Amino acid sequence: MPFVNAAGLGEYDVIVVGSGAAGGQTAYTLAMEGARVLMIEAGRRYSPESETPMFHTPDQAPLRGTSTPEKPFGFHDATIDGGWQVPGEPYVNVSDDDAGRFEWWRARMLGGRTNHWGRYSFRNGPYDFKPKRRDGLGFDWPLGYEELAPYYDKVEMLIGVYGANDGLENTPDSSPGCLLPPPKPRVSDLLVQDRARRLGIPVVAGHRAVLTQALDHRKLPRKLHPGNASAQAIIAGHMQRRAACFWATPCGRGCSVGANYQSTTVHLPPALATGKLDILVSAMVHEVFLDREGRASGVRFVDKTTGTNGEARARAVCLAASACETVRILLNSKSARRPDGLANSSGKLGRYLMDTVGTSVQGQIPLLEDLPPHNEDGASGGHMYAPWWLYGEQLRGKLGFARGYHIEFQGGRTMPSMRTVSGLEWLTSGSYGRKFKEDARRYYGSMVNFDGRGEMIPNEHSRCEIDPAVKDRWGIPVLRFHWQWSEHETQQAAHMQKTFAAIIEAMGGRVRGEVIADGARAIAPGGSIIHEVGGAIMGDDPQSSVTNGYGQAWDVPNLFVTDGATFPSNADKNPTLTIMALAWRSADHILERMRRREL
């Protein structure tokens, strides 16, 4: 069962819409356990092995690889046919005010955003699953950390995550054998760690989905698929084909040796090897249709290659197209009996959209000037980070905002780009020629960037709906967004700015630009961190949620949502690892229901 076209579809147990972290994990789990799966992807086929510019330097790219409207993260970024604006696929914002706008990032390619993402892989902690119980705000999840912990273990072992167990509050340790050794800290990391700890801020090894050593292909397959010899053999062979990272290139380009997690190198190859997975690319799903009993029969799509309409049928449907795209499909799956869309008897579909709170500060550190030339390429992203450390003060109401953030930071002498040189202008005072070269050598590697990533509390004002007038190039109605930050988020962003400046000062450095005291100005626009979740939240009550704790729609028993749309809260931990853990758990539930002939 390989890549297929719209005319060659067979009979399937499950249709999975989407091929990124959620779709990849869902399809992998189902196929490895014997279910017949059709994956449908809106973008084109993509191969990291042949399309990743692993060893290209910036001078080999147009404009030395700098950002363009078509490539917002630079020419060498892995994203194809994607970005905040996709030609022919508009979306609408109700507000013209920057504070009320939502920027929607999409990647129209096999593997979706997993080809591009930062690979930060944090577990939600016990507080994160029951936030309302702690402070009375937002929603609790219909499951706790203990229920998801075994799936966090499995995902970490499968994809490969480096990190360490530090025993910190609400920052769960992994089970023995799950984590790979973290990479060696850079000089700037050690300096940040030393000075931040003087301020009471813990700095520990980061957790990222990058192989610092080869996976144990002898032990891990038995833990991942107990009692399934066929699956064990397939994944053992696949693990042997993934090489450890040798620090060749930024992870955002993708990886031709499989050293970081992309669904295109980790989930899809072994799932295809089972013979149970078909993949249909360039097919835009726009509707889930039902049978006379109100059960999902399949999906309708536009074949983007031919422009024709098509259908696919299965015993169950899993939507994993990314939070907003999944909501769009459900809202467009309306009928005379369901004028407000499918799975929307609660009226909550499209509501409680969330992103991560973000803001940044850069500092120049004289202690890091004029260091001897040395290689600090490493795992491209941060080797260390600072988890949230003020739970007690926050619970006592001393901070002015209810939820926390973590700090990602990076410095060091990594491969320079156009941004490296242009970023020195505030220090070089217009120097030119030999003097500029001397300045570049002096200041190169002395910059440290601090990025805050914080929790947004769901609110009634942040939501999406179908625009009544605008359609995309395929004739599919598009989303219209409403967005609003609360004071919890803006005060949090202001706290980030103040904290980053304090760390830079403790390092003996100077801040580039101003420290923004007004959190409403400091906070990044909604959607720009590309961590949007919610819109089809899970819960215990069908009157106030769209799905149960397995992502199973209350209204349609064989319809599942396995992406971030089900999140009822958005912790400061980047959501991808939790998305995959939930998807694995949901897929296990689907398999069990099928064994009992309930689907």
Question: Where are the regions that the model predicts?
Answer:
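N-terminal Rossmann-like FAD-binding beta1-loop-alpha1 element of flavoenzymes
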Residues: 14-39
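A conserved short coil-to-beta-strand element within the FAD-binding core of flavoproteins
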Residues: 208-209, 281-295
